[in-house]
Amino acid sequence: MSASEGMKFKFHSGEKVLCFEPDPTKARVLYDAKIVDVIVGKDEKGRKIPEYLIHFNGWNRSWDRWAAEDHVLRDTDENRRLQRKLARKAVARLRSTGRKKKRCRLPGVDSVLKGLPTEEKDENDENSLSSSSDCSENKDEEISEESDIEEKTEVKEEPELQTRREMEERTITIEIPEVLKKQLEDDCYYINRRKRLVKLPCQTNIITILESYVKHFAINAAFSANERPRHHHVMPHANMNVHYIPAEKNVDLCKEMVDGLRITFDYTLPLVLLYPYEQAQYKKVTSSKFFLPIKESATSTNRSQEELSPSPPLLNPSTPQSTESQPTTGEPATPKRRKAEPEALQSLRRSTRHSANCDRLSESSASPQPKRRQQDTSGSMPKLFLHLEKKTPVHSRSSSPIPLTPSKEGSAVFAGFEGRRTNEINEVLSWKLVPDNYPPGDQPPPPSYIYGAQHLLRLFVKLPEILGKMSFSEKNLKALLKHFDLFLRFLAEYHDDFFPESAYVAACEAHYSTKNPRAIY
């Protein structure tokens, strides 16, 4: 387009140049740059002008900018001296304002000053400035001796800038287990080829999955910590990998990870996690008219009495507390079964809350709940929750372990636990990802209350790209990726529970009728 238009370009594509900071609000400095492309653009008055796509050396390509010809200088010795002159001025100006260093870094300036020849004097710069120096500001013409000190002080910030650039350019990889890769392929096939949808709300929603994982993680961490020598407590934390830090620290990191997944999922689902065929379903299930929230008739202080008294099936803790509890074979309920027993459908978020209450009630010997819970557990719960029940030491300082499953081995295993560690485990088992009063009754629930493992797994395909736009230190990123890996292994281990084929139904059955709204929390 350049030659045919008759436009004469001063610079050509691929040429190394110096370019002024394009943002007029930033300090006027010159960057090392390269011209990527040239076009004929237009100025504010509509006149044709040459424009150059500039890549700033050492920066991610997302920072490439279009610049007018008057912002670009040839890479000559004379212009290099101008570059150093402007860099010292910018540093001195920032110092004179008294700003904190962390808030006044000048990207690219430190590297310019770092390569300053020692024999080069300020007066040489003054005499050799080209006419283009007239464009710079008139302020701070006299550079004080402090600027030399400032150069040495600011140079040490260059590694931080370099680290930030490396973070922008690094590739983040999350390894997805083969069984979950196949699930992603099947998911795509069901939605796009067979035109089926995941029935919503899911039997096991994302809140429940994440809370279950924290409990699973805490129990495994406690077991592994109990097997280590006691003197591991004296090891310096700074020299320990994330695998070897104390169990309570691991659990805290795990909680932060799942909460971050919840927030990220709620935000990104409508943006990047839905196939086009699912958009209409999303709009319908997130409508405020679609779900009818249940109002609890008693406060948490009276909840024990409420549970011991007759109550509707949906609120009665003696009934199975999750949709997973319905099928006796451990498999998810079929759509036909859901229609036959609509009252049993409820959020596992709510069931987790009730389950914790049942555990607290069971500590009283007068309560009939433990026996009933014991009878119902082994035959009706999916193997994931049976697995947690068998490994879970739910007891307090003043009571003996509750026999959630008829196993003498469990008591023997937990007999060696210290009281402090047992209390930590019990604290995790009663932990909730979100408060009881969230979301408010007058608002539709967020996606993490409605969707399940199928859509959560899709998030891990997008996470590398999302994490690449975030600022993480190498140490924190490594720990986060390790937690993601452990969580994906958890999903893979229980994929039969989390990804039942029966979750995909015809579009007409993909959500419950608005004439009979379902409660999901």
Swiss-Prot record:
Transcription regulation is among the record's keywords: yes
Amino acid composition bias (Basic and acidic residues), ranges on this chain: 150-166
One GO CC term on file: NuA4 histone acetyltransferase complex
Origin superkingdom: Eukaryota
Bias type Acidic residues, positions: 139-149
Subunit and partners: Component of the MSL histone acetyltransferase complex at least composed of the KAT8/MOF, MSL1/hampin, MSL2 and MSL3. Interacts (via the MRG domain) with MSL1 and KAT8/MOF.
Protein name: MSL complex subunit 3
PROSITE patterns listed in its UniProt record: MRG
Annotated positions of the Phosphothreonine modification: 405
Organism: Pongo abelii
Any one GO BP annotation for this protein: regulation of DNA-templated transcription
Record region (Required for the histone acetyltransferase activity of the MSL complex): 290-440
